[in-house]
Amino acid sequence: KASLISSRGCPFHCHFCSIITFYAASPGKSWRGRSVANVVDEMEQLARQGGASHFEFQDDNFFVQPKRALEIAEALRARGVDFTFAFLTRADQIVKGEKYFPAFRQAGLRYVGAGLESGSQGSLDRLNKETTVEENSRALHILWGNDVAAQVDFIMFEPNTTVEDLEQNMDFIESHGLFGYFPPIILSTLALFPGTRSREEAEAAGIAFGSVHESLPYHFQNHDAARVKVLLDQSMGTFGAAWYELVIDLQDELARREAELERANGHTSQLLPLVREMKLEYSGLASLPYLLLKRILREGRQAGFEPLQAALLMQPTLFEFNAARLRVARVRDRL
C-alpha cells in the first residue's frame, strides 16, 4: 500500500476545516492539481519499484475534477499496472460525479472517504457544508450501488448541537445501515482548530477555552445536548477501552478466518457456520455505543436529561457487553 497526494487545497468553505487557513498564505488558486502524467509516473514507480498494489490518495479533496481523477486511474491501468485505490471527497461531489463511478469501480476504486458530517440540516448549515441531508443519502447509495465502500466522516457533536440534531443524526444513521459503524461515528466531536470560522465563533460566544495553539475544548450552547455528551462519555469511560479492544480483535480474527475460508477449497462445513456466528457477535458488539446513545435520548425525552445517571443508563449495555464476551470466547473455543 502507498499513500500519495495528487493535489493541494479545496475550493469549498466549511467553517470547521483548517485547510482554508493552512493554504491562505499561499498565492494562487485554492485548489491546485498535479498533471495526470506526473501523478501516474509516481504511481508507476511506487508499483514497480516499491511493490505497491493499492494507492490511497491523501488529497484534501481528490474529486474536485472528476474527469482528471478518472484519467489518472485509467492512465495507470493503461501502463499495465494492476492496482486498487481510494480517495477522499464530499457528498455533493459524489452526487455531481455519479456518472463516473461505474468506470471508477472498473478502474480499481474500492472505497471513498465521504465527508458527510451530519444527518441534520441545521448542523450542516451551521458548519457551512453547502450540502444537504438528501445529498448525503444519495452519495452513500451511489457508492454502494457501484460496489464501492464508504468510509464515513461524521461530526455528531459541535458547539451548537441540539438534542433534535442528535435525534436526526440517529435517524439518518439507522436508516442508512450505519448503526454499528466502526469506529463509532456517534462519538465524534468537532475540533476547533486555529484560524477556523467555527473556532472564531466559539471564542466570540465565550464557550471556548484553552491554549491558542491547539484544538480548543469548549462548552456546548445547548444544556440538554451537553448533558447527553457527558452521559455518553461517562458510560463509555467505564467499558469503552475493553470494548474497543474486543471489537478490534474480532475484526482481525474475522479477517484471518475469512482468508482460511478462501483457502479451504470448498471444505468449509465446520468453519463457515462458526465464522457466520462470529460475524453476528461482531455486529452486535459494534452496535453497543449506538444502542447506549439511543437509550440516553429516549429516556432523556421521557424524564428529562438532568436527572439521568450514567451508572444506571449503562447497565443494560454493560450486561450485554459481558454476555457477548462470553459468547465470543465460546465460539473461539470451537474454532
What are the language-model segments listed below?
Residues A24, S175-P184:
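Alpha-helix termini
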Residues D153:
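Short acidic/histidine-rich active-site segments
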Residues F12, K67, G122, R126, ...:
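Flexible glycine/acidic-rich beta-alpha junction loops that bind and position SAM and/or redox cofactors
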Residues N160-S175:
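Catalytic cores of alpha/beta
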Residues R199-A202, A208-L335:
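Radical SAM enzyme core and accessory elements
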Residues K1-A150, E158, D171:
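Radical SAM [4Fe-4S] cluster-binding motif and immediate context
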